[in-house]
Structures are given as C-alpha cells and as structure tokens.
Amino acid sequence: MTNIRKTHPLMKIINSSFIDLPAPSNISAWWNFGSLLGICLILQILTGLFLAMHYTSDTTTAFSSVTHICRDVNYGWIIRYLHANGASMFFICLYMHVGRGLYYGSYTFTETWNIGIILLFTVMATAFMGYVLPWGQMSFWGATVITNLLSAIPYIGTDLVQWIWGGFSVDKATLTRFFAFHFILPFVVSALAAVHLLFLHETGSNNPSGIVSDSDKIPFHPYYTIKDILGALLLILVLMLLVLFSPDLLGDPDNYTPANPLSTPPHIKPEWYFLFAYAILRSIPNKLGGVLALVLSILILAIVPLLHTSKQRGMMFRPISQCLFWLLVADLLTLTWIGGQPVEHPYITIGQLASILYFMILLVLMPIASIIENNILKW
C-alpha cells in the first residue's frame, strides 16, 4: 500500500515542506524564527478576527468599542492584549530572523531574501495601520505625522496625502480604510510567506558554517519539528508572561486617552519596534531627506547581497565582520532608545551619529572588512 502522505496531491506538498524535507544537520536555534513567525502570524490573524467581530471602525465609537471588548466581551481583554503584545513578539522574531540572515549570509539566496524584504515592509504597514485603530491620542497623532511624511514627495505629495486621508485631515474615512487594509494585509502576508518558503525550498536551507550541506542532510520530522515545538513553547511562555503580568509594558499611556485633534501630545512616537527608523527619520533636518533615509533604512537590506565581498558565506569564521555585526546591533538598540526620547540636546547629536554609523557599517565598513579578511586568508 502506498503512503497517502506521499501520494495525495495536498498531503505531498505538506510532506515535502514539513515532514520529509531534507534539512542541514547543524542548523542552530537561530533557524527557529521562521516557524515562530508563522505561529505569530496565525495568532495575529485569529485574535484579530475575534477583535474585528466586536470592533467598530467609526471615529465616534472606535475607542469605546475597544473598551467594550476589554470590559464586556468574554475574555475580550486577553484577546486584545494577545493581539497587541503578539505584534511585539512578531517584530522581535522578525528582527532576529533578519539578523540571522545578515550574520550567516542567507541573503545570498536573493529571491528568498527579496521576498523577505517585501514581507518586512508589508508587516510594518499592517502594524502601523493596526496602531491607528484603537483611536487613542497616539493612534490619531501617529497616523497624522506618518501619513503627512508623504507630502514631502515633490509635486504630487499634498494630493497624495489627502487621497490617503480621504479628506483634509485624518478622520472617519481614514479610520475606515485603515481597518479594511489592516484586515486584508495579513492574508497578503500569508501568501507572500508561502512564496518565501517556495523560493527557500528551491535552494534548501543555509547553515551556520555557510558550507553546502547536501552531503549531510536529515529529515525535518522528527528532528526539527520537535525543535520548533520547543521554540514555540518558549515564545508562548514569554508572550503569556507579557500579557498576564504587564500587558501595557510596551504600549503608550497616551493611547488610553481618546483621540483629540485639538490637543497634541507632548511626545509623538510610534510603537517601540519602529523607533529605530523613527530616530533615523528625525536625525535629518530636511523633510524629504528624512523620508528617504527612513525608507532606505529598510531598503538597504536589498543591496546587502551586492555588497558581499567575502569569500566565505557566513560570519562564523570572520572575526572582524562579527565585531561590526554586533556593533550594528548595538547601534540599532541606541537608535531605538533615541527614537523614544524628546528632540533636544544631547539626543539629537547621538541620533545623528547613530544614523550615520548604521549606514556606514552596512555600506562601507562590512565590505571593507570582508576584503581584509580575504587577504588574511592568503597569509
């Protein structure tokens, strides 16, 4: 009798992707984040679906409907906080996943890497629009400030902003369309994630050594399924600790005040996971320059494969590049801290230096370090 797992049209796709998939025998816990991102996405879609059943996307009732979910809906509070903190876990996993790709040279799979960048942009857009929905002070002013950045685009900027707003300010039309987009985009993300996996399975996974592992493969199940389950349990543990003990730790207190167009909060800032990009945006005095730097801070990932000058794939045996990589991580943490601070001395200078260093490491220092390491190999 033939195994249904290997013959059924649907089952054989699942089988070749998650069961009999040949995987390198030495991939570390850094390779867990792909599956964790999948779990985060499923969690966000499910909790979001239940929230959407009770949420109303109208400026007069949006804030009240979120309060109603927390107070009157059965387990509404936990669904709401799972969704809010689930987004934070999503971004932690995303940044770890991208960091792993940079460290181990996974970006040499250019198709997979480029789809990943598109995924990152899509998830960021989804999260931004989701932050607007509770219609608190930071929701309203965050939406106003970030959408207003598009007015820096020459000639069409102002018209573009008013088109996105659906009027002359962030109002009912804006909230309704943001809700519609926030609902549909996670499904777009799911489709892109499938394409991401499709491209990955064309080449097979990278591994910590960066050496081709075709001669040493093991089946995905049971070895990596059990490893992924362990990762998932740890993710759920951290998420539940956040949700049940300090659900508002990563949020902004200003968002518990209903949106008021007549009162600007003293410090407008996005959620913590956008602070590094926000700091780069603010570090350039010119509006258009700031917007370009903001976009380039993520888009720079697309040219990383072109700047790969090393003879080795990963950084496992490249000490100079390792130092630069961890300097980049420290720099991003500094930018995240600066993004949450008011625009005053010394934060302005620190932010500008950190922004310059960010682009310097990726564009100049890492390619030079790779060339030096190549020459050291000849000794």
From Swiss-Prot:
Q: Which UniProt keywords apply?
A: Electron transport, Heme, Iron, Membrane, Metal-binding, Mitochondrion, Mitochondrion inner membrane, Respiratory chain, Transmembrane, Transmembrane helix, Transport, Ubiquinone
An annotated GO cellular component: mitochondrial inner membrane
Pfam families xref list: Cytochrom_B_C, Cytochrome_B
Respond yes or no to whether keyword Kinase is given for this record: no
What InterPro entries does its record include?
Cyt_b/b6_C (IPR005798), Cyt_b/b6_C_sf (IPR036150), Cyt_b/b6_N (IPR005797), Cytb/b6-like_sf (IPR027387), Cytochrome_b (IPR030689), Cytochrome_b_C_euk/bac (IPR048260), Cytochrome_b_N_euk/bac (IPR048259), Di-haem_cyt_TM (IPR016174)
- Cofactor binding mode, per the note? Binds 2 heme b groups non-covalently.
Residues involved in a ubiquinone binding:
H201
Molecular functions per Gene Ontology: metal ion binding; ubiquinol-cytochrome-c reductase activity
Q: Which SUPFAM superfamilies match?
A: a domain/subunit of cytochrome bc1 complex (Ubiquinol-cytochrome c reductase), Transmembrane di-heme cytochromes
Asked if the record carries the keyword Mitochondrion, the reply is yes
- Transmembrane residues, as ranges? 33-53, 77-98, 113-133, 178-198, 226-246, 288-308, 320-340, 347-367
Q: Can you say where in the cell this protein is located?
A: Mitochondrion inner membrane
GO biological process terms on file: mitochondrial electron transport, ubiquinol to cytochrome c
Residues annotated to bind heme b b562: H83, H182
Which prosthetic group or cofactor does it need?
heme b
Which residues are involved in binding heme b b566? H97, H196
Kindly give the membrane topology term recorded for this protein. Answer: Multi-pass membrane protein
Function noted in UniProt: Component of the ubiquinol-cytochrome c reductase complex (complex III or cytochrome b-c1 complex) that is part of the mitochondrial respiratory chain. The b-c1 complex mediates electron transfer from ubiquinol to cytochrome c. Contributes to the generation of a proton gradient across the mitochondrial membrane that is then used for ATP synthesis.
State the remark under miscellaneous: Heme 1 (or BL or b562) is low-potential and absorbs at about 562 nm, and heme 2 (or BH or b566) is high-potential and absorbs at about 566 nm.
What the record says about family reads: Belongs to the cytochrome b family.
What is the annotated quaternary arrangement, including any partners? The cytochrome bc1 complex contains 11 subunits: 3 respiratory subunits (MT-CYB, CYC1 and UQCRFS1), 2 core proteins (UQCRC1 and UQCRC2) and 6 low-molecular weight proteins (UQCRH/QCR6, UQCRB/QCR7, UQCRQ/QCR8, UQCR10/QCR9, UQCR11/QCR10 and a cleavage product of UQCRFS1). This cytochrome bc1 complex then forms a dimer.
Q: What is this protein called?
A: Cytochrome b
- Protein species of origin: Phoca fasciata (Ribbon seal)
